Amino acid sequence: MSRIGNKVVVLPAGVEIKQDGNNITVKGPKGELTREFSSDIKMNIEGNEVTFIRPNDSKEMKTIHGTTRANFNNMVVGVSEGFQKALELIGVGYRAQVQGNKLTLNVGYSHPVEMTAPEGVTFEVPANTQVIVKGINKEVVGELAANIRGVRPPEPYKGKGIRYVGEFVRRKEGKTGK
């Protein structure tokens, strides 16, 4: 059984936290994140260490305990280091361009696909077949990267499509002729 909720979250230098009822605000060098947490879980701050305490050991409380700690840790890592997801475009003529906060993908459709970055998220295109999504909120970065991948998921026969860097795509054999 996981015991993530019992682990201590160590605050790096330059990260401040503020608690206002159930809302916790984490402020750091990269930005500021606010999130509402369960009122059942109590937060205990000692110096630069934060622990979370649950009222009882019921299964429901254990799940909320671990989730609360993991979400808080993601907020701390996000405002101090940030998160990024890298994608690659594989296919003839597949390319990406960024203009301001708009990403334009040419991935074999009759029209280019445009995506707009939400607030706090940026796109980088180091090469015209690579896209890097960066931001401080792990959930938003992951969801946006998944939406970009969903425009043209990798297909199993030729391997064409948009995939995460390092993602393994299981290949299939084509039909065999007579």
UniProtKB/Swiss-Prot annotation:
Keywords: Ribonucleoprotein, Ribosomal protein, RNA-binding, rRNA-binding. It comes from the Bacteria. GO terms for cellular component: cytosolic large ribosomal subunit. GO terms for molecular function: rRNA binding; structural constituent of ribosome. Disulfide bonds: none annotated. The keyword RNA-binding applies. The keyword Repressor does not apply. Pfam families: Ribosomal_L6. InterPro entries: Ribosomal_uL6-like, Ribosomal_uL6-like_a/b-dom_sf, Ribosomal_uL6_a/b-dom, Ribosomal_uL6_bac-type, Ribosomal_uL6_CS. Transmembrane segments: none annotated. One of its GO terms (biological process) is cytoplasmic translation. Belongs to the universal ribosomal protein uL6 family. Part of the 50S ribosomal subunit. This protein binds to the 23S rRNA, and is important in its secondary structure. It is located near the subunit interface in the base of the L7/L12 stalk, and near the tRNA binding site of the peptidyltransferase center. This is Large ribosomal subunit protein uL6. The gene is rplF.
